């Protein structure tokens, strides 16, 4: 790995999707941290998150989509108004979110969490 910032930026911008998953990790709430023994987790659609920063700070809602190409997360009822009045989802960075409830419909994800090896 290079130390040069321009090469670091290029690497993150051109990273394949399976590597970009690491860029959409958010911290777990204290209760979940105790339960699973890990500090953060990859955010999936269906997880419930709390917005920590910005105009919508304190808002708690379900994740609608996780966009790996842009490494952004869209949360239910967190929108921004366009110039023509249309409401569109506001893209949020995972560092500004805290996961308060996990979507455990995926049995493989649940097994990884129990092992303490969530990717």
Curated annotation (Swiss-Prot):
Domain of life of the native organism: Archaea
GO annotations of cellular component type: large ribosomal subunit
GO BP annotation list: translation
InterPro entries: KOW (IPR005824), Rib_uL2_dom2 (IPR014722), Ribosomal_uL24_CS (IPR005825), Ribosomal_uL24_euk/arc (IPR005756), Ribosomal_uL24_KOW (IPR041988), Translation_prot_SH3-like_sf (IPR008991)
A Pfam family per the record: KOW
Keywords: Ribonucleoprotein, Ribosomal protein, RNA-binding, rRNA-binding
Segments crossing the lipid bilayer: none
A Gene Ontology molecular function term of the record: structural constituent of ribosome
NCBIfam families the record matches: rplX_A_E
Oligomeric form and interacting partners: Part of the 50S ribosomal subunit.
Database matches in HAMAP family: Ribosomal_uL24_A
Role played: One of two assembly initiator proteins, it binds directly to the 5'-end of the 23S rRNA, where it nucleates assembly of the 50S subunit.
Family to which the UniProt record says this protein belongs: Belongs to the universal ribosomal protein uL24 family.
Name under which the protein is recorded: Large ribosomal subunit protein uL24
Source species: Haloquadratum walsbyi (strain DSM 16790 / HBSQ001)
Lineage, top ranks: Archaea, Methanobacteriati, Methanobacteriota, Stenosarchaea group, Halobacteria
């Amino acid at each position: 790995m290079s130390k040069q910032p321009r090469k670091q930026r290029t690497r993150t911008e051109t990273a394949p999707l399976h590597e970009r998953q690491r860029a959409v990790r958010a911290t777990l709430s204290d209760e979940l941290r105790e339960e699973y023994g890990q500090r953060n987790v990859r955010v999936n659609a269906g997880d419930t998150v709390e917005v920590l920063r910005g105009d919508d700070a304190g808002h708690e809602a379900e994740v609608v989509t996780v966009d790996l190409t842009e490494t952004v997360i869209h949360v239910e009822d967190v929108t921004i108004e366009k110039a023509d009045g249309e409401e569109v989802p506001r893209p949020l960075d995972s560092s500004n979110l805290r996961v308060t409830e996990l979507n455990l419909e995926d049995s493989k994800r649940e097994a990884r969490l129990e092992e303490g090896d969530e990717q």
